[in-house]
Amino acid sequence: MSRLKRIAGQDPRAGFKAAGRDCGTSVPQGLLKAARKSGQLNLSGRNLSEVPQCVWRINVDIPEEANQNLSFGATERWWEQTDLTKLIISNNKLQSLTDDLRLLPALTVLDIHDNQLTSLPSAMRELENLQKLNVSHNKLKIFPEEITNLRNLKCLYLQHNELTCISEGFEQLSNLEDLDLSNNRLTTVPASFSSLSSLVRLNLSSNQLKSLPAEINRMKRLKHLDCNSNLLETIPPELAGMESLELLYLRRNKLRFLPEFPSCSLLKELHVGENQIEMLEAEHLKHLNSILVLDLRDNKLKSVPDEIILLQSLERLDLSNNDISSLPYSLGNLHLKFLALEGNPLRTIRREIINKGTQEVLKYLRSKIKDDGPSQSESAAETAMTLPSESRVNIHAIITLKILDYSDKQATLIPDEVFNAVKSNIITSINFSKNQLCEIPKRMVELKEMVSDVNLSFNKLSFISLELCMLQKLTFLDLRNNFLNSLPEEMESLVRLQTINLSFNRFKMLPEVLYRIFTLETILISNNQVGSVDPQKMKMMENLTTLDLQNNDLLQIPPELGNCVNLRTLLLDGNPFRVPRAAILIKGTAAILEYLRDRIPT
């Protein structure tokens, strides 16, 4: 009832009357009524050029429903209203906000992104309860000092403005956990920035920064630092002491040397692609014990040291577009799920092997790890077995590499002799690619307790039989270049599957069963006819990091796909949708996801 106290002599209905007149049709009374109950009001995308007075005064004036019912015994007690705590007025045409903002002191969330604001009202500093403020995609040129008084602020989004500097006093935001200043015109970061001791995520990408302050290492809780697309030539050595850092993005800068990270024992992802790095040495690698993703693409590397084997947790390694002519064979002993080598003058690995993908490259490198003895080709020739069918089974591959290889035979069936050759040997991989198979060999089920990798690409498969669904240790499955348009629901039993390649088939939608294989990390389904994806189901796939949807029939990309924050590689080129535009796609996955998130209706 405290909200209903009025200044002496004031007409108790006057405020309401003004509110109703000011709102017109831009803000329906039903929406205001619901907001008084829920404490949340969403006015996004209403073409507003100013905020109606009835919004600012929502908890001050007597509502319209008071006209219909003044009884204290009424079912709907209009006087028992909830203070507005969340206000969303994004995607409008607002050029300014008035100081009437102070009439909403209970606000904890204020979203005013995607407007035309050039400043913030001084009353902003009075919103002492505010925890989340989104002012992104506006026209702010000067850092709003009003923000520095918001001591309870935890999330601040100022990306896509025209800021050139950060004002003093910013360090007073001691509770800030998430700060996005990307896509501005910042040239420096003040040393006082380091006082943001609670900061967990900091995005400084797409600015004009030439350096980072040494004091950055005082941010003891920082886990995610994004400095992509700046002008950085060096990284302060103090950054190596950030013990909590897990994700570091330094792509598209001017770095010539890879920093060392002696204290960053928790670092999981290091992205330094598109720089000018010329050398990768053991000192750069030996402390990266937890690294999962290492992006070195588009640099000037000439070699990869043998010490790469120290990165035992590494899952994704991108070396594309460098000057690398050879790879250490020890690389084959890493448990990589993705290895990119395109655009290098490699002379020690045939292009045919590289085109077969990561697992084939690793197997090839492992086969070369020998201190003595004959070469692989000589050994294979000596141990190959001639079968009655005149087929040749590589016994060396079975015994040494644990591969059952009957590829590139143009066979319509896999002879029994091939499976018989396994005998008591342990087999972890099957390669029946480049044949004329119309169905999956039934005898594959005999290897269900062993096999983790299966390559059935470049065949004539139009359906998947249940035999494949019984390979419960399967982690890698290559089915590209077949005639598939669906997958059986029974594939849900493949509870260890991490990578599936369905490119160059006939799928018109992402198979439903894939959404239920929560171990999946990589889905490659380019060059099909996929017309839609379900972002809600995909968000549940928390391990999914790579999704290739290139060259399909996607007419639109659902904004909710931006919530799939675990995606590190999202490929969408070659689809007929108009948004996101090509200019967004070329910026990479992080930019695409951010673009999509900013357009989620709220």
UniProtKB/Swiss-Prot annotation:
LRR repeats lie at residues 83-104, 106-127, 129-150, 152-173, 175-196, 198-219, 221-242, 244-265, 266-286, 290-311, 313-335, 336-356, 400-421, 426-447, 450-471, 473-494, 496-517, 519-540, 543-564, 566-586. SUPFAM superfamilies: L domain-like (SSF52058). The modification Phosphoserine is found at residue 71. InterPro entries: Leu-rich_rpt, Leu-rich_rpt_typical-subtyp, LRR_dom_sf, LRR_domain-containing. Coiled coil: none annotated. Keywords: Leucine-rich repeat, Phosphoprotein, Repeat. Residues 1-20 are annotated as: Disordered. GO terms for cellular component: cytoplasm. PANTHER family: PTHR48051, RAS SUPPRESSOR PROTEIN 1 (PTHR48051:SF1). This is Leucine-rich repeat-containing protein 40. It comes from Macaca fascicularis (Crab-eating macaque).
